[in-house]
């Protein structure tokens, strides 16, 4: 067998000191085993730990854990320098050696404890008392001047608070560190035995089949550690029995340690607090050891324990007086009862009274069993221990003494019986010998050997005879009888057992787990069973037995949770065990209702406990339906109604001679005084018997319904009628018990009816049976309501404790009835005086208004709050059922049986509001009431805060009207906390604050799990409520500053809660996340939000971050890790700069400032930072859980977004980058993932890929700024396969799934739509089954219908889950698209400019095609897909532009052009308000592609023809059609702009640009006739001319500031902006580029129309120019220079001299413009100003490119016209334009290039861009110009035009000269 190593138990020192491995302390193991769901138990770390063989040895030999063995050599090996080089190891070694010597343990164990303290130092710091700064914040939050805050502030102890810095310095000292080490040592000792105790309970008593991993772990541990077989059926008893003596020895050691402190421990450490902790630790260890020993003994049932074990045990009990030697201190009072209970249980278990009595009756026990009765020595020790304890008055010994007296009594009887038989036999032998003397001697030889049977030898003395003789009990049993009398006098033993049963029960007062308690109570039950033959049926044993069964359980403890059958044995034995059933159960039945409580309590307890055992539960309810006997006080009125019978038997039997009415006269006629009710008649002939000698109590053999009888008696009690009855009226206690029993049984029936195979009608039948004897206008619910009304209306002073108990029981009954007849309960609550009504205040506050909250008042208040919560739940969950009405709803219940029919929504809303008001009253009073214990306060705060939380959640989870009835109540709660009056702000917050303080000051306990659970539930309820309030305020847009301020002030408490209990970690982080998010959004635009780190303080913040950055190590629960990472991301995103810096750098601001220096930036990411932890996880991103991976990536991406330096920090971690690249490189197609792992896995995969893309994009962006991106971008290209496949095509949406689901849902649930379950955004949505539709709400609302679950779970629940998963996938794919878009844009900027990246260019073009193809597919109508389509189009446009800029577009664009065209044609309403932006984007894409087509195709044949045909189609279906439509819309817009359609001048400009691009495509010039026909078919020419003619009255929908509104802007272009005139001429200008079209324009009289237009008149004005003061004049100049002159040129070029006269005539229509063009070109100082009407006023001489273009066009026109005039001077008029002067000016500008550069002004954004671009070198200075090369593109273009003007003019002048 391999040697066991402790590597798992104590990991290597290096890993522990660096934090790579967290030691699994026994405290962590114990806390994990305390979890209700045992979720942490299946974590890999803990599972490995528990399966470790070394740990198994420790479990079986607990003394080895802290044994004082010298392991110095092993210690040195573990701490040697070769094992670790981490700093601080010397201190660790010194502390370990000190601890080992101080408390006498081995060095290795001490080392483990010191390392645990080292790793939990942040916990230790956070659980220190609050600093003065923290106390000040808490006082401010509580309201220092508020009298109600005194109870809360008293918990702070402000006088002892010290400064945070002083506290930290003290915390770092050696003395404090060693105090913490000692505390850790004691904690580990307590936790070890607690962990073993919990583990043994889990192994032996957990119900199998609940969780596969748990079952596997349980089997492995039972097999490996305790030698069970594979089926867990045949355990090795020897292994089990060794645990009992082992842990009993540990108890002995605990007793010794409890009586003395460590001898070598320094005196400075022996403080009062340490002494108390030492004592409590020893006792706690003893209690858990006792529990382990008891469970081991219990598993050995029913065998005798070895007599050696009994001998040792009772010797220990004798020496310690049943542990009273260490339990007699007040400071350990809470530990005393658990210890005493287990001591008694173990003693009784060892005495084994059942088997002992059987043994004393000659029971044959199996071979190998050693009864302790065979050892007189053991018996003597038992007797001595019991006698001494009883004589010393030890209460724990009384049950043992009682059992021992029964055993010794039986021994004495056996001894006396054998003695009498021996004496009788001796006498018989003596007489026989005397007679033989007279017989003849001759017969002697013939005598045979006699049979020895019955001889004295056969009556041997029993082994215990020696014990009896030694103790002188052989003849005198009086000493033992004295012991029994001491035990039973005044019912002491029964009282003790009742108290122990409470400690061993299942309520919050129980000290142990239910399994241990149930088995221990079974031992006490056995004792009562065995004593039943000696002690008659009487109050003490009966009520002790009921206490053992009930253990304090009340109505609210009823549950249908499954439990192991062995745990229910204490209940089932009341039915199955013959003795118990005969002596107790049947006695209680037969004495009912004369003795009321035993039977009622028995039914109540058994009905509640046996819910999951249907057969047994039916037996109990059967007693109530068919009670066999009726025991009553005989009414004298019945004296003539019976006759005696069976007189010879002297049994006092009788027979009724007439019918007897139990609630009326007994006359033969049986008058029907109430004809409308069924009467309780005992028929004639019924047999009975008088059962008492004194009094006349009779038991009638009359089977009846106890339910109906109870209902009648409650009615009589409620009405306070005086009835001639055979039974006395119920007293108040009986009334309370009766109602409680009915409520409990009804609740049990309701729970059973919902279980598989249950009867849905059973609860209703129960109510009907209880109402059977009532008048027909009443039922049991009416009786309960009348009872409440009668009690509530009484004055406060008249209500005593029992009456309040009745009221509480009635509220419990209403709660039980709520599940059966909710409409009735709501109707009653609307008129119940407990809560406020329309014109009355609620009386609940009056009844509970006293400061002293004694038991009955507390029960009433708790019951009321729980009832209110159930009412709110029922209102929320029944929303669909109430709307079903009387329609034929196919469900579990038919429409006729709908319990909500007739319920008014108004009533529900009004009652809910009253409940909210009552809840607030109770909530505010919880700080002032004096409770019996803080536990009661915790229960009430938990319930009332939970009620308010439910209201907020129910009202805001859904976006529909389904929960609108709760909206007023929720609004009342929210407004009370968010916008309270100034005086009530702190008052509202005090109970919440008190909860946080109580959670911090309450120490962790390994006992009383119920109390720990209640406190945890209280705290988590408060935290969840605060979170919901913040979320609701943010969602509703309400102010939340008061609550936000209080929470920030309480941040020091919130940060400490996870250190107090790990259960609080997740809810605290959720609250802090909501707090920083809401505060960050509220502070937008109004300054910085409050600083979380500022309120925490630097030291507390550092400890808090250290605590939570462990991300639930070592358990690694995914849900906790996700919550933690989301909190970190929220801090990063919401302007918590200081806290964010601490997360990212691992240093507080103070530490960062101390670092300083030049290396500050390089050292920002510390080893212990959260960012470093994130990158550590991302190194293993492939193996990381997908949910945690999403959360980690979200944090990293947020850090890079808000803190750019982190981008370089991530980039430096090459392993992280490589891991992310490898992750996306290995991703499978979502379709494959869905088939293998489901839609959720595909969604998370896509979301992670999106985050990875964002990360790479941000890295590329910042690297590009440093010109380092090209290499990384090139590497990434190889990893883009997943993005290229899935980045654009959001194919996940399953339209048929959602359509069919919505249709089927509406058909199944009339009046309700599936969208009614759409989740609001008040809580962040999470990918998964509950993403879009609130599945948990639907489960509550629709669970009543059979179709919701469906056959084999295939109903609407499954469909909703599938729909949510599908929408999760869509959401993830949309995120993937946007991230891919971001990454792709960065890649194109880095790679496209390089020609060698042609392969990447093809990939980019592939993405463009994917975008266009995706948009042409059928899209769902949801807005998200509309937005997505627009985004795809935008991405395609950007990519095409970048491809074009890089000259990377393909030469053959046929396919691309076809895609764009089909995408454009697919737009149904291109100029609709929703589609117009998208249509514009497509037009821009078309323009870019057409520009690429202008370069020609690779093959001049077929492809050219195809492109030409496509271009012609575009001209027809896009250009001409859109131009006409836009022109019409412009006119309509001007008249009526209410149709929602808004066009812009840019649209016409875009169409013109497309026209230009189309006409530029090679080969289109050969299709002029087709183009002309297309344009003519759409009347484009006329439309353009009309648009120009109306331009002065058509203004753009969104005018620029320069052309903004004046009253005359619609008719005066001098003040408006006639932009449409320019656009119309530009469109005609592009058409005129084709000669055929230019000729058509001229023939249609275009020039005449232009000259005659109103706009032409404005163009003739003198203020027209490029630098005009208003937009109209500037636009007129643009029309002249950019449109009219080029248009005239095109027409002149097309028609030549034919049109020259008309062109010249048009030019002469604008003499001012002709003259001003010459003046504008003049250089500064070129000529003196002249007084001329046509001249422009003097101005600062600047020149623009448009002005140069103007003279260039005029130069060409005038020269061509001059040539025509030379041939035909008569027809062609002269155009007056000073060309010579212009030439002179041009020469000047060309020679003075510096002046030109200074005076050249850009007019538009494009020219501004040219000015910033370097010149291409295409135009340089000409020799003789005296100038140099151009510096920018704008200058270059201007020089080119000037050179062109010079060439034209010089040529013209030379010709003239010639």
From Swiss-Prot:
<keyword id="KW-0653">Protein transport</keyword>
<comment type="similarity">
    <text>Belongs to the Nup188 family.</text>
</comment>
<dbReference type="InterPro" id="IPR044840">
    <property type="entry name" value="Nup188"/>
</dbReference>
<dbReference type="GO" id="GO:0051028">
    <property type="term" value="P:mRNA transport"/>
</dbReference>
<comment type="function">
    <text>Functions as a component of the nuclear pore complex (NPC). NPC components, collectively referred to as nucleoporins (NUPs), can play the role of both NPC structural components and of docking or interaction partners for transiently associated nuclear transport factors. NUP188 probably plays an important role in NPC assembly and organization.</text>
</comment>
<dbReference type="GO" id="GO:0031965">
    <property type="term" value="C:nuclear membrane"/>
</dbReference>
<dbReference type="Pfam" id="PF21094">
    <property type="entry name" value="Nup188_SH3-like"/>
</dbReference>
<protein>
    <recommendedName>
        <fullName>Nucleoporin NUP188</fullName>
    </recommendedName>
</protein>
<keyword id="KW-0906">Nuclear pore complex</keyword>
<dbReference type="InterPro" id="IPR041634">
    <property type="entry name" value="Nup188_C"/>
</dbReference>
<dbReference type="GO" id="GO:0044611">
    <property type="term" value="C:nuclear pore inner ring"/>
</dbReference>
<keyword id="KW-0472">Membrane</keyword>
<dbReference type="Pfam" id="PF21093">
    <property type="entry name" value="Nup188_N-subdom_III"/>
</dbReference>
<keyword id="KW-0813">Transport</keyword>
<keyword id="KW-0539">Nucleus</keyword>
<keyword id="KW-0811">Translocation</keyword>
<dbReference type="GO" id="GO:0006405">
    <property type="term" value="P:RNA export from nucleus"/>
</dbReference>
<dbReference type="GO" id="GO:0006606">
    <property type="term" value="P:protein import into nucleus"/>
</dbReference>
<dbReference type="Pfam" id="PF18378">
    <property type="entry name" value="Nup188_C"/>
</dbReference>
<dbReference type="GO" id="GO:0017056">
    <property type="term" value="F:structural constituent of nuclear pore"/>
</dbReference>
<dbReference type="InterPro" id="IPR048883">
    <property type="entry name" value="Nup188_N-subdom_III"/>
</dbReference>
<dbReference type="Pfam" id="PF10487">
    <property type="entry name" value="Nup188_N"/>
</dbReference>
<keyword id="KW-0509">mRNA transport</keyword>
<comment type="subunit">
    <text>Component of the nuclear pore complex (NPC). NPC constitutes the exclusive means of nucleocytoplasmic transport. NPCs allow the passive diffusion of ions and small molecules and the active, nuclear transport receptor-mediated bidirectional transport of macromolecules such as proteins, RNAs, ribonucleoparticles (RNPs), and ribosomal subunits across the nuclear envelope. Due to its 8-fold rotational symmetry, all subunits are present with 8 copies or multiples thereof. Part of a tetrameric NUP188-NUP170-NIC96-NUP53 module.</text>
</comment>
<dbReference type="InterPro" id="IPR018864">
    <property type="entry name" value="Nucleoporin_Nup188_N"/>
</dbReference>
């Amino acid at each position: 067998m391999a040697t066991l190593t402790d590597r798992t138990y104590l990991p290597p020192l290096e890993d522990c000191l660096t934090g790579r491995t967290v030691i699994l302390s026994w405290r962590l193991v114990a806390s994990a085993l305390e979890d209700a769901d045992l979720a942490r138990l299946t974590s890999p770390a803990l599972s490995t730990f528990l399966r470790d063989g070394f740990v198994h040895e420790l479990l079986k030999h607990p003394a080895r854990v802290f044994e004082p063995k010298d392991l110095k050599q092993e210690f040195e090996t573990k701490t040697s320098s070769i094992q670790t080089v981490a700093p601080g190891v010397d201190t660790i070694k010194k502390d370990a050696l000190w601890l080992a010597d101080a408390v006498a343990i081995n060095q290795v164990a001490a080392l483990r404890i010191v390392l645990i303290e080292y790793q939990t130092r942040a916990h230790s710091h956070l659980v220190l008392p609050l600093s003065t700064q923290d106390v000040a914040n808490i006082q401010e939050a509580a309201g220092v001047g508020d009298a109600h805050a005194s109870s809360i502030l008293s918990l702070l102890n402000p006088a002892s608070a010290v400064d945070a810095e002083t506290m930290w310095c003290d915390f770092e000292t050696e003395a404090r560190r060693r105090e913490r080490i000692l505390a850790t040592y004691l904690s580990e000792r307590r936790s070890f035995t607690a962990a073993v105790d919990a583990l043994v309970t889990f192994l032996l008593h957990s119900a199998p089949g609940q969780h596969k991993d748990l079952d596997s772990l349980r089997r492995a541990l039972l097999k490996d550690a305790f030698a069970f077989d594979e089926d867990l059926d045949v355990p090795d008893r020897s292994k089990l029995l060794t645990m009992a003596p082992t842990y009993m020895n540990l108890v002995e050691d605990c007793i010794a340690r409890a009586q003395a402190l460590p001898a070598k421990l320094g005196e400075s450490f022996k403080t009062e607090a340490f002494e108390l902790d030492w004592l409590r630790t020893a006792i706690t260890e003893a209690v858990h050891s006792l529990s382990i020993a008891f469970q081991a003994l219990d598993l050995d049932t029913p065998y005798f324990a070895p007599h050696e074990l009994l001998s040792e045990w009772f010797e220990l009990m004798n020496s310690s007086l049943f542990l009273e030697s260490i339990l007699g201190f007040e400071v350990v009072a809470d530990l005393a009862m658990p210890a005493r209970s287990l001591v008694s249980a173990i003693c009784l278990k060892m005495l084994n009274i059942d088997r002992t009595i059987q043994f004393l009756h000659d029971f044959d026990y199996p071979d190998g069993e050693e009864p302790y009765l065979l050892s007189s020595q053991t018996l003597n020790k038992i007797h001595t221990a019991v006698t001494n304890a009883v004589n010393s008055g030890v209460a724990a010994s009384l049950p043992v003494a009682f059992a021992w007296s029964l055993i010794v009594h039986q021994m004495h009887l056996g001894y006396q019986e054998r003695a009498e038989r021996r004496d009788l036999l001796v006498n018989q032998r003596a007489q026989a010998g005397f007679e033989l003397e007279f017989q003849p001697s001759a017969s002697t030889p013939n005598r045979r050997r006699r049979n020895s049977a019955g001889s004295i030898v056969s009556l041997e003395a029993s082994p215990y005879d020696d014990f009896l003789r030694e103790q002188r009990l052989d003849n005198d049993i009086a000493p033992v009888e004295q012991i029994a009398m001491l035990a039973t006098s005044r019912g002491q033993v029964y009282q003790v057992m009742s108290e122990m049963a409470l400690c061993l029960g299942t309520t919050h007062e129980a000290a142990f787990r239910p399994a241990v308690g149930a088995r221990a109570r079974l031992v006490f039950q056995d004792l009562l069973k065995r004593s039943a033959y000696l002690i008659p049926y009487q109050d003490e044993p009966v009520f002790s037995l009921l206490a053992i069964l009930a253990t304090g359980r009340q109505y609210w403890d009823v549950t249908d949770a499954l439990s192991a059958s062995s745990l229910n044995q204490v209940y089932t034995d009341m039915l199955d065990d013959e003795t118990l059933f005969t002596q107790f159960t049947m006695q209680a039945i037969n004495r009912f209702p004369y003795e009321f409580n035993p039977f009622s309590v028995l039914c109540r307890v058994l009905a509640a406990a046996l819910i999951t055992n249907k057969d047994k539960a039916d037996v109990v309810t059967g007693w109530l339906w068919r009670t066999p006997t009726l025991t009553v006080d005989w009414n004298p009125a019945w004296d003539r109604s019976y006759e005696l019978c069976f007189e010879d038997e002297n049994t006092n039997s009788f027979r009724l001679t007439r019918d007897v009415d139990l609630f009326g006269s007994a006359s033969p006629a049986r008058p029907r005084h109430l004809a409308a009710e069924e009467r309780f008649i005992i028929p004639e002939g019924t047999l009975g018997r008088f059962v008492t000698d004194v009094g006349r109590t009779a038991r009638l053999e009359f089977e009846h319904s106890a339910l109906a009888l109870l209902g009648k008696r409650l009615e009589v009690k409620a009405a306070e009628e005086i009835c001639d009855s055979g039974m006395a009226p119920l007293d108040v206690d009986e009334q309370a018990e009766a109602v409680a029993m009915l409520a409990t049984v009804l609740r049990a029936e309701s729970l059973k009816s919902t279980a598989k195979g249950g009867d849905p009608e059973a609860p209703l039948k129960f109510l009907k049976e209880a109402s059977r004897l009532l008048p027909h206008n009443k039922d049991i619910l009416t009786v309960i309501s009348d009872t409440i009304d009668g009690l509530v209306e009484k004055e406060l002073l008249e209500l005593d404790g029992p009456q309040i108990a009745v009221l509480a029981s009635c509220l419990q009954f209403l709660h039980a009835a709520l599940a059966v007849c909710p409409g009735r309960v709501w109707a009653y609550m609307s008129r119940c005086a407990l809560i406020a009504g329309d014109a009355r205040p609620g009386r609940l506050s009056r009844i509970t208004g006293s400061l002293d909250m004694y038991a009955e008042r507390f029960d009433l208040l708790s019951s009321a709050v729980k009832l209110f919560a159930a009412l709110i739940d029922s209102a929320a969950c029944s929303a669909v059922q109430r709307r079903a009405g009387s329609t034929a709803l196919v469900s579990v219940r038919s429409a006729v049986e709908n319990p909500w029919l007739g319920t008014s929504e108004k009533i529900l809303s009004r009652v809910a509001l009253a409940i909210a008001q009552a809840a607030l009253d109770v909530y505010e009073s919880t700080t002032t009431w004096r409770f019996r214990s803080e536990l009661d306060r915790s229960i009430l705060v938990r319930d009332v805060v939970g009620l308010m939380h439910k209201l907020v959640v129910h009202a805001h989870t859904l976006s529909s009207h389904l929960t609108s009835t709760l909206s007023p109540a929720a609004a009342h709660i929210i407004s009370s906390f968010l916008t309270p009056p100034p005086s009530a702000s702190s008052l509202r917050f005090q109970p919440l604050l008190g909860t946080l303080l109580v959670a911090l000051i309450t120490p962790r306990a390994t006992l009383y799990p119920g109390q720990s659970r209640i406190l945890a539930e209280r705290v988590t309820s408060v935290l969840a409520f605060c979170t919901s309030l913040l979320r609701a305020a943010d969602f509703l847009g309400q102010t939340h500053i008061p609550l936000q301020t209080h929470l920030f002030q309480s941040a020091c408490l919130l940060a400490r809660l996870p250190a107090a209990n790990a259960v609080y970690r997740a809810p605290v982080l959720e609250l802090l996340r909501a707090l920083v998010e809401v505060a960050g959004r509220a502070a937008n635009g109004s300054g910085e939000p409050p600083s979380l780190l500022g309120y925490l303080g630097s030291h507390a913040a550092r400890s808090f971050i250290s605590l939570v950055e462990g991300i639930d190590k070592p358990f690694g629960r995914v849900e906790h890790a996700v919550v933690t990472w989301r909190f970190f991301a929220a801090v990063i995103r919401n302007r918590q700069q200081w806290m964010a810096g601490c997360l990212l750098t691992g240093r507080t601001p103070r530490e960062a400032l101390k670092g300083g220096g030049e290396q500050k930036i390089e050292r920002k990411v510390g080893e212990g930072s959260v960012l470093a932890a994130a990158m550590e996880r991302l190194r293993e991103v492939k193996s990381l859980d997908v949910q945690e991976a999403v959360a980690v990536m979200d944090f990293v991406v947020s850090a890079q977004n808000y803190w750019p330096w982190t981008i370089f920090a991530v980039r430096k971690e090459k392993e992280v980058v490589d891991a992310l690249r490898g992750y996306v490189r290995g991703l499978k197609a979502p379709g494959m993932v869905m088939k293998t792992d489901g839609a959720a896995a595909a969604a998370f995969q896509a979301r992670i890929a999106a985050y990875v893309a964002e990360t790479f994009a941000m890295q590329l962006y910042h690297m590009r700024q440093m010109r380092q991106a090209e290499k990384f971008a090139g590497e990434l290209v190889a990893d883009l396969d997943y993005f290229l496949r899935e980045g654009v095509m959001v194919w996940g949406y399953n339209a048929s799934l959602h359509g069919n689901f919505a249709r089927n849902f509406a058909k199944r649930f009339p009046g309700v739509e599936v969208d009614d379950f759409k989740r609001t955004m008040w809580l962040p949505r999470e990918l998964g089954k509950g993403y879009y539709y609130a599945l948990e709400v639907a489960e509550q609302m629709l669970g009543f219908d059979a179709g919701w679950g469906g056959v084999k779970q295939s109903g609407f629940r499954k469909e909703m889950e599938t729909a949510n998963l599908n929408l999760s996938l869509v959401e993830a794919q949309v995120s993937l698209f946007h991230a891919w878009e971001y990454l792709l844009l960065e890649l194109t900027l880095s790679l496209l400019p390089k020609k060698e990246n042609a392969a990447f260019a093809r990939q980019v073009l592939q993405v463009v095609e994917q975008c266009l193809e995706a948009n042409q597919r059928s899209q769902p109508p949801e807005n998200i897909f509309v937005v997505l389509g627009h985004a795809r189009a935008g991405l395609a446009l950007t990519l095409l532009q970048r491809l074009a800029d890089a000259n990377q577009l393909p030469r053959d664009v046929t396919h691309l052009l076809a895609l764009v065209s089909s995408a454009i044609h697919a737009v149904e309403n291109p100029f609709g308000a929703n589609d117009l932006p998208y249509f514009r984007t497509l037009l821009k894409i078309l323009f870019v592609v057409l520009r690429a087509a202008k370069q020609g195709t690779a093959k001049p044949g077929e492809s050219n023809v195809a492109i030409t045909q496509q271009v012609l189609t575009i001209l027809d279906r896009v250009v001409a059609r859109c131009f006409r439509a836009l022109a019409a819309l412009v006119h309509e817009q001007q008249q009526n702009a209410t149709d929602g359609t808004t066009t812009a001048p840019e649209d016409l400009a875009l169409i013109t640009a497309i026209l230009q691009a189309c006409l530029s495509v090679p080969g289109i010039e050969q299709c002029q006739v087709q183009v002309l026909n297309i344009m003519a078919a759409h009347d484009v020419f006329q439309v353009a001319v009309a648009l120009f003619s109306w331009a002065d009255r058509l203004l753009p929908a969104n005018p620029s500031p320069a052309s903004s509104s004046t009253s005359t802007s619609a008719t005066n272009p001098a003040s408006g902006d006639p932009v449409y005139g320019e656009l119309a001429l530009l469109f005609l200008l592009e058409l005129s580029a084709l000669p055929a079209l230019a000729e058509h324009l001229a023939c249609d009289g275009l020039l005449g129309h232009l000259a005659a237009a109103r706009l032409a008149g404005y163009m003739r004005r003198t203020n027209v120019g490029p630098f005009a003061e208003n937009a109209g004049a500037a636009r007129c100049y643009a029309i002249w220079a950019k449109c009219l002159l080029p248009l005239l040129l095109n027409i002149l070029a097309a028609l030549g001299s034919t049109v020259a006269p008309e062109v010249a005539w048009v030019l002469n229509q604008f003499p001012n413009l002709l003259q001003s063009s010459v003046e504008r070109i003049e250089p500064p100082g070129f000529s003196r100003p002249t007084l001329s009407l046509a001249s422009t006023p003097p101005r600062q001489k600047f020149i623009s490119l448009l002005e140069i273009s103007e003279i260039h066009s005029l130069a060409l026109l005038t020269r061509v016209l001059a040539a025509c005039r030379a041939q035909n001077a008569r027809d062609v008029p002269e155009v007056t334009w000073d060309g010579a002067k212009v030439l002179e000016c041009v020469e000047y500008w060309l020679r003075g290039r510096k002046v030109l550069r200074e005076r050249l002004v850009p007019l538009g954004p494009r020219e501004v861009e040219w000015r910033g671009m370097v010149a291409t070198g295409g135009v340089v200075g000409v020799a003789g110009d005296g100038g140099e090369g151009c510096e920018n593109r704008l200058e270059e273009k201007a020089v080119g035009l000037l050179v062109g003007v010079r060439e034209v003019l010089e040529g013209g002048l030379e010709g003239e000269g010639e």
